Amino acid sequence: MIRTLFSDTPFPPLEQALIEPNGLLAAGGDLSPERLISAYQQGIFPWFNQGEVILWWSPNPRMVLFPQELKISRSLHKTLKKNHYQIRTDSAFTQVMQACAAPREKQTGTWIHPEMVAAYTTLHQRGIAHSVETWVDGELVGGLYGVAIGKAFFGESMFSRVPDASKIALVYLARQLERQGYGLIDCQMKTAHLMSMGAREIPRLQFSKLLGKLTDQPEQNRKWHFDFTWPKQQ
């Protein structure tokens, strides 16, 4: 059995999460900024279909990308050197979420529905949720969004309309976060795409301990303005 959350119910301990489905911890509650911030600080995230009860997850193991471990393939490195794109932050947050919600091959439905868009847009307005965007000739062609708390970034979703567009956004995000002392990018679940870029699985307990240190650092709740000049040595 999983715990049912009401407006004032705290999350249960992570070790109470189910083994199957992996990481299901609780149901109910709401998507208020306070609830979402508390969830991320503890290594919990919402994931549910439109019209269903809110489900909260903390899978074990957890997929993370340590910024200093980012891997760039030869083909992606060539694309980066061409520099025919522009990287922006927080200039089209809702557009990025809507693009991430668009139907994808072999998928039926999406978990990024209007309720989620509204909740994360509120976080964005508070300077907590952010987007990193890849633009070409004034057109948004790829990007990602997530939540920043302390020195941890929690990635939520990414999209590409042209090859490598989301990878480019992730590369620039990782480089900027490394420069600013961020400890990790939470990738939630294992994917071959993220593993190819250096992400790896760690035990949930280790992830939780890292978050305890990283999210306890001073908040910088503001719109992001990064210097996206690609280092020449790269």
Curated annotation (Swiss-Prot):
It comes from the Bacteria. GO terms for biological process: protein catabolic process. Its main location: cytoplasm. The keyword Acyltransferase applies. Transmembrane segments: none annotated. Its EC number is 2.3.2.6. One of its GO terms (molecular function) is leucyl-tRNA--protein transferase activity. InterPro entries: Acyl_CoA_acyltransferase, Leu/Phe-tRNA_Trfase, Leu/Phe-tRNA_Trfase_C, Leu/Phe-tRNA_Trfase_N. Keywords: Acyltransferase, Cytoplasm, Transferase. GO terms for cellular component: cytoplasm. It is found in: Cytoplasm. It catalyses: N-terminal L-lysyl-[protein] + L-leucyl-tRNA(Leu) = N-terminal L-leucyl-L-lysyl-[protein] + tRNA(Leu) + H(+); N-terminal L-arginyl-[protein] + L-leucyl-tRNA(Leu) = N-terminal L-leucyl-L-arginyl-[protein] + tRNA(Leu) + H(+); L-phenylalanyl-tRNA(Phe) + an N-terminal L-alpha-aminoacyl-[protein] = an N-terminal L-phenylalanyl-L-alpha-aminoacyl-[protein] + tRNA(Phe). Functions in the N-end rule pathway of protein degradation where it conjugates Leu, Phe and, less efficiently, Met from aminoacyl-tRNAs to the N-termini of proteins containing an N-terminal arginine or lysine. Belongs to the L/F-transferase family. This is Leucyl/phenylalanyl-tRNA--protein transferase. It comes from Nitrosomonas eutropha (strain DSM 101675 / C91 / Nm57). The gene is aat.
